[in-house]
């Protein structure tokens, strides 16, 4: 089994560091809370121990509307893009766009700020997240598996 690779993070330095143990090899579901910005994210995943785990409480605040994407071995995240920018005086994740292998596309937040994009090639998958969070999702990075 290949070890997941960390890519990123994108965003600001506010909030507290967020990460998971064991490291993820496949995402099972993800929940994003958003309005004008990305308020919070949470996910469940299969770890390097082949057991299902949760990221725990949402990383971020309590605002926004919640949306969940359920994934499986044939429907996985192949690309995430988004923007990071100012919200008040804080640098945070202002938008996310999620694309799955089955063509499911979801967009969260306003889309204002500096863009980033993480496409995964050759059958790779976005298996999980790490980053920083406080009252909002301050920064986000990704675990990629082949």
Curated annotation (Swiss-Prot):
Region entry Disordered, spans: 1-21
Alphabetized InterPro entries for the sequence: Jacalin-like_lectin_dom, Jacalin-like_lectin_dom_plant, Jacalin-like_lectin_dom_sf
Paired cysteines (S-S): none
Domain Jacalin-type lectin: 4-146
Predominant location category: secreted
Molecular function per GO: D-mannose binding
Stored Gene3D superfamilies: Jacalin-like lectin domain (2.100.10.30)
Domain of life: Eukaryota
Keyword Secreted included in the entry's annotation: yes
Keywords tagged on the record: Apoplast, Lectin, Mannose-binding, Secreted
SMART domains tied to this protein: Jacalin
Pfam families (UniProt xref): Jacalin
Family: Belongs to the jacalin lectin family.
This protein's name: Horcolin
Lineage: Eukaryota, Viridiplantae, Streptophyta, Embryophyta, Tracheophyta
């Amino acid at each position: 089994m290949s070890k997941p690779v960390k890519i990123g993070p994108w965003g600001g330095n506010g909030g507290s560091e967020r990460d998971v143990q064991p490291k993820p090899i496949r995402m099972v579901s993800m929940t994003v809370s958003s309005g004008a910005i990305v308020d919070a994210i949470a996910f469940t995943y299969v770890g390097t121990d082949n057991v299902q785990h949760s990221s725990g409480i949402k990383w971020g605040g309590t605002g926004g509307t919640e949306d969940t994407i359920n994934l499986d071995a044939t429907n996985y995240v192949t690309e995430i893009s988004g923007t990071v920018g100012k919200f008040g005086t804080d640098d945070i994740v202002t938008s996310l766009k999620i694309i799955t292998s089955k063509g499911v596309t979801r967009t969260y937040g306003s889309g204002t700020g500096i863009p980033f994009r993480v496409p995964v090639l050759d059958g790779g998958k976005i298996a999980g997240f790490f980053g920083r969070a406080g009252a909002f999702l301050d920064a986000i990075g990704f675990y990629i598996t082949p």
